[in-house]
């Protein structure tokens, strides 16, 4: 039995001699009991702990549902009927290209700057400053609310047509009921939103497959669906606009199909790894959406007549194999797109309120639950969406959404352009007019380390060593004071000796006189980060004074050599000729080596910003002017109520100054840059002694001292006359 007891002890206690692989006898039973389901009354329906998502279950799904929206199901046939197949594919590609440039610009901003959880607002605010970021953020929230109203209205129109109810108030009633239901899901938490989106995404895929299969399995000539025909495709290839329509009006109606590309940025606070999840998920969603759009345009142009494409908005339902599945996809896309807007807009509004960009909205910054669900912001955005529901027409709301989002995308594109130009200005080799100049900063040594040569002024360390030779320190007093301190610590308060001027100079300049000249550059390093040294000095003095019963306000000088050692440069600082700089609040970083970072180009972003502004005015110049006017008013208001907002990471880059400099360069040859020699705040003043006579027998009898004599004014004048 004596041999069995140790083994039994091992099995019961789970370990012996540090072994961690041995389990308890009843480990399996305990594990099974932990995995058993709880009673139904203890199940938590709502989210009580933070939930984070990844690339495919979070970003890709949300972007696809928002991009693959009601515009695709209701307006693709109308687009083909006006622009034709060829120009329709060009228009779809152009819409996706504008969205792609904006996504790449957003990825570039996230790569270069640290972005918070505010999505579009955080990107613009970090780069262009709080005033511009707050202005664009408010306009983006407004656009999301209008887009949500448009999606709900499209859903209500389809339901009313299905029920043969053409009353406008029926459409509005259905829209309000749906909006209230979506607000309830949003309040339940982000976990339920993502779960519902996964189900909706699956149903969307089924409805799309139903449309593709139905295009070659049956015909419906009475409703314009005549099947594949080469002649029909030739007739539908080129544009033939209805009266009052043009390429840009069609673009304005169809562009909201791509407004969901920024959803991934808006949910950055709920992602596991935003720096990886957002780029991969957004780019994958854009590529998939472009392919499906092109398939829809080509199929509708090859199987349907132009007249029905123009005037029958539900032509895609006639093509589908099972019309109910297509309607299900339409309903789901409408609800999902609206839910995406109701998810992103309140969180951006919450971020703006938390940063107190607009002090009047600070009460909206509160959140409920572990994911900080913005309850108050959800209600505000819901009311704003409800107000636009009463307009009740998709073709009226679509241009408003387009122009608002074009302004937002232009701001994102310009943000990446400006932050890249600012980064290049900071790292330009021709800065200060010299190709190899080094910029002095408060965290770099004011005295650059060079070897001592003939004619040099020396260093502060050498100057202090000369002071040692002039004022001999009394080395015999230190042991006595130390011993007296050890004998009676209480008397140290009253018998504290005052240090000579030489030692105070040593403490001020952090010089170590115990190191020999063989240390070279290490002994000459002067750390000039005064803020850190002062904080260290005060902490060291207060700590020592508390330990020894001394009032810290009684003296500002260090009490012993240990205090001087605290101020000495660290080994990391002495090992290099330059001191590592502090990371500023808005540090612009270099692009990573990822594959998507290679496609981020600031010139393309700049062209995208200009193109977005031009498209705004071409689509509807009145709406464009109204948006710009509201943006200017918001900018001035935010600057007035909160003038102390951050200037942004690209504050040193001025667009107008860059334009003026470019104009001067084009008009005439650039003038040679002026070079300014700026002396540092602490000059490298020092003294150096040199022995002019050699050590040999010829001069052995000569005294080792210098002679001096007084010369009167008359003798001085006579000597040089």
Curated annotation (Swiss-Prot):
Membrane topology, as annotated, equals: Multi-pass membrane protein
UniProt KW keywords: Chloride, Ion transport, Membrane, Potassium, Potassium transport, Symport, Transmembrane, Transmembrane helix, Transport
One GO MF annotation is: potassium:chloride symporter activity
Where in the cell does this protein reside?
Membrane
Q: Which GO terms describe its biological process?
A: cell volume homeostasis; chloride ion homeostasis; chloride transmembrane transport; potassium ion homeostasis; potassium ion import across plasma membrane
Ranges that cross the membrane: 53-73, 84-104, 115-135, 136-156, 174-194, 196-216, 247-267, 283-303, 321-341, 374-394, 397-417, 606-626, 628-648
**Positions with biased composition (Acidic residues):** 553-565
Question: Do the record's keywords include Transmembrane?
Answer: yes
Coiled-coil spans in chain: none
Spell out the Pfam families in the cross-references: AA_permease
The domain of life is Eukaryota
Q: Which GO terms describe its cellular component?
A: membrane
Q: What ranges does the record give for the region Disordered, renumbered to this chain? A: 473-505, 533-580
Which protein family is it in?
Belongs to the SLC12A transporter family.
Q: Name the PANTHER family for this protein.
A: SOLUTE CARRIER FAMILY 12 MEMBER 8, SOLUTE CARRIER FAMILY 12, CATION COTRANSPORTERS
Q: Per its database record, what is this protein's job?
A: Cation/chloride cotransporter.
Protein name, please? Solute carrier family 12 member 8
Organism, by scientific name, is Xenopus laevis (African clawed frog)
Gene name in the database record? slc12a8
